[in-house]
Amino acid sequence: MADRRRTDDNKGAREVVLLLNIGSPDSPEEKDVARYLNSFLTDRRIITLPFLLRQLLVRGIITPFRKKSSAQKYRTVWDESTRSFPLISHTKAIARALAHTGREVHVAMRYGKPAVADVLKELPHGRSLVVLPLFPHYAMSSYETAVEHCKAEIRRLCPNLSFRVVQPFYAHEAYIRVLADNIRPYLTKPFDKLILSYHGIPRDHLDKTTRQALNLRHPEGCCTEEDPTANVCYRYQTYRTTALIREALGLAEEQVEQVFQSRVGHTEWLRPYLIERLSAWPQEETKRILIACPSFVCDCLESLEEVADHGQSIFKKAGGADFTYIPCLNSGANWIDALRNILEE
């Protein structure tokens, strides 16, 4: 069910769609990357330290030390012809494709441009809004921060707006079907294992999310079966997506492995880490891998630079023979049809 708030009587008006994604810097220049890092990392749902400590850490240490290396990575995925990053371009392409189905569709980013506030100011009056976060799984550092920021901006700028928010679609039949269809053609080539790599999160985010949402402590040994925390448990939701993809593809358990990527810092994140498994697989006679990233609906820095490029290099240097990256759903026609189904429920 979608989270609904109705504040006017115009319930019959056709909904305007707002696609929410995480965002990218304005360019790969260091100053733009630094501005993006400051905005992203000072979010209390990303780094959960007290405000002043978080500001000092990010602006005084993390951004000054990371902006150069981050800018170099962003340059590898920058498209000079469109002067944009893949995440932005693909999200806008999704919006254009959905608009062809007869809906009015807008795009906003949690960090960077187009900003939620700017988009809300352009919405037509007297229409209801459906907010579609392009995050299949619930995490405080992705789905939650994007949705709560959007709600805050709606309260501030258009408090009488009627809107609803689409819930995470990690187990939605249409999402699983299009993921499986996206992967299936690659199974015709010989492979040892299909790897499903999800964006990682700090382990303590599981506890913080369940305490905040449900006033519960995240139970030990959870996540393999549904329990009261399932609606806000990122790890459970990724496990569920993996199981459903495996079933849809007709693969045995030993043919599919789930990992987590993009860890930063020294705290404990969800395991197993992709970066460690890339070197280990060849030693385990897993030398031909297919790898997909189901937590990203659009190709982005993390899928292209971290996995398809850097990940392949690590795997090959460790003795891997064949590394096949499976692109994200992006704006494919089947994905647009799946989004229509998700929106209409």
From Swiss-Prot:
The gene is hemH. Keywords: Cytoplasm, Heme biosynthesis, Iron, Lyase, Metal-binding, Porphyrin biosynthesis. Belongs to the ferrochelatase family. It is found in: Cytoplasm. Gene3D superfamilies: 3.40.50.1400. This is Ferrochelatase. It comes from Porphyromonas gingivalis (strain ATCC BAA-308 / W83). One of its GO terms (molecular function) is ferrochelatase activity. Coiled coil: none annotated.
